[in-house]
């Protein structure tokens, strides 16, 4: 599991409800479900990732965060996670506003494009 996911999981209390936006293959969701008894849901844009998640028994729907977050009822989750995807949105401010409507707490991570391990690939 990615180090980042371990850090995120430490911020989330046991027995809570979490929406993972851009959940990818569901690795973090599965960990939270198995290790912290978290009720997880996912929103993912990739059909292949949605299929992969559902084959693991995870509750994931296909959707675009910029268009579909408003469909979730206000404060329907304790936490919402947006990991490593904020930079891909056309309107990140709207996405953040929508995240904060869906949950009491938002955990947002972004890539560190200045880190040497990232920059070394440019040379």
Model-derived segments and spans:
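Class I SAM-dependent methyltransferase SAM/SAH-binding core
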Residues: 31-68
């Amino acid at each position: 599991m990615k180090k980042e996911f371990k850090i995120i999981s430490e911020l989330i209390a046991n027995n809570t409800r979490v929406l993972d936006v851009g959940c990818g293959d569901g690795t973090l969701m599965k960990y939270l479900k198995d290790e912290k008894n978290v009720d997880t849901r996912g929103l993912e844009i990739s059909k292949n990732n949605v299929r992969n998640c559902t084959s693991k028994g995870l509750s994931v729907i296909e959707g675009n965060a910029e268009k579909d977050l408003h469909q979730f009822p206000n404060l329907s989750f304790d936490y919402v996670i947006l990991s490593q995807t904020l930079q891909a949105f056309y309107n990140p401010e709207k996405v953040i506003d929508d995240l904060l409507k869906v949950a009491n707490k938002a955990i947002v991570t972004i890539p560190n494009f200045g880190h040497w391990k990232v920059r070394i690939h440019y040379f």
